[in-house]
């Protein structure tokens, strides 16, 4: 059965995007409403959420302030929130709340695909605040690049000490490596990862949507498939801010689960592995080896150098980064090793 049939899309619908020309994909800076020809693609905005009462109002206010003129629906796909997320979302006109019984983000995004009436699906998370021209720039980048998916950088916007420390770790070279999507100053280019972003609904459906076997890293798994379908385009003008986790414990749990998901992706697609992704699991193994003391001292020296750079810009965040970086690396590394073992039986025999 094809992905389109599985997701229940109307096969008679002809996406507007197919009628638009696909210019040179090396164009580095599409502008909103810049020389568009033909009808504008209809857009569905999808928010897969779970217990985001503290952030959903700001998120939806930003979504409802978009400059793009053809947003046909805003779907809040709720995974059974135990707080007031659903009630808050229901108070916004033009917002439709739909159920995600499986609770997972991958399942919630597939619910959005089945419900979508738009030609383009723009994903927004509950902890994210998008710029007013976010959708406009997503559609412009999709049209001009011809990519299967486009997105921009991640920009942490913490207010508490922990949130700022986590944000500093996320955007540092030690935390992010050379990843383009964590650098707001990076130039537009083809890439293997972006933050959230937008994709053509017909392409997503043809690929079968999100893999619901993934409880985390569902976006990374899909991005790998999309990179072979039409490519992933990074545009630094697609701007949004993200509220980091508010405690080191929840941050560590988040990255432990990310590590599990990344390992499952590598098991499924070995070619998706990047050398930098081995650093954290090798660190964990090194700390368990007979050379643990030397490994620990070398690692702490590297962290100290990275923290020193941040201290010159933000003393409080830099000090917190000394906790956030090891928390990030160790939890992700342990998660990767656990995920590697867990996913062995799922993919090794295929």
Language model segments and positions:
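Catalytic donor/gating beta->alpha subdomain of glycosyltransferases that bind UDP-sugars
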Residues: 211-273
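A conserved acidic beta->alpha catalytic loop
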Residues: 62, 78-86, 125-129
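Short aromatic/hydrophobic "clamp" motif used to bind/position activated sugar donors
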Residues: 121
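Cell-envelope/extracellular polymer assembly enzymes that use nucleotide-activated donors
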Residues: 41-44, 73, 221
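Glycine-rich, basic loop-to-helix element that forms the pyrophosphate-binding segment
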Residues: 100-116, 137, 190
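Short, flexible, basic/aromatic active-site loop/helix in glycosyltransferases
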Residues: 152-158, 167-196, 205, 263, ...
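Conserved donor NDP-sugar-binding/catalytic core segment of glycosyltransferases
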Residues: 129-164, 168, 239, 243
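Short, acidic, metal-binding catalytic loop of nucleotide-sugar glycosyltransferases
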Residues: 61-71
